[in-house]
Amino acid sequence: MLSNPKRTRFRKQHRGRMKGVSYRGNHICFGRYALQALEPAWITSRQIEAGRRAMTRYARRGGRIWVRIFPDKPVTVRPTETRMGSGKGSPEYWVSVVKPGRILYEMGGVSETVARSAISIAASKMPIRTQFVIAG
């Protein structure tokens, strides 16, 4: 199920900049294995969900998966063939702002080989370079 905030204070946001590295959310907290971002990017709720589904499908019933990012930034898109002006477009989808070092997914309760395979499948769904990390 695609995730987005239940309610926000404002409908639209500035685009912002992604400079520097992530100093929050860059340590493994819940599981034993994790997928860590190496590049800055906006990751859409669809991409997050695709990665989560791929990991869940590969791990079957064993193990537990934690998604450590949440899409809380609305991205607006103007209608096609619209002239300039007349305000900002309407919110179309949600993204999570990810900086280098950020943990995207965590996994526990499975062997390292299973975790490595599942996380590599999820990594292929991501628009950025990532690395497999082991806690400890």
Curated annotation (Swiss-Prot):
InterPro entries reported for this sequence: Ribosomal_uL16, Ribosomal_uL16_bact-type, Ribosomal_uL16_CS, Ribosomal_uL16_dom, Ribosomal_uL16_sf
GO cellular component terms, semicolon-separated: chloroplast; mitochondrial large ribosomal subunit
Superkingdom in the source lineage: Eukaryota
A Pfam family it matches: Ribosomal_L16
Subcellular location: Plastid, Chloroplast
Molecular-function GO term, any one: rRNA binding
Keyword annotations: Chloroplast, Plastid, Ribonucleoprotein, Ribosomal protein
Subunit structure: Part of the 50S ribosomal subunit.
NCBIfam families: rplP_bact (TIGR01164)
Family named by the database record: Belongs to the universal ribosomal protein uL16 family.
Protein name (record): Large ribosomal subunit protein uL16c
Lineage of the species this protein comes from: Eukaryota, Viridiplantae, Streptophyta, Embryophyta, Tracheophyta
Annotated gene: rpl16
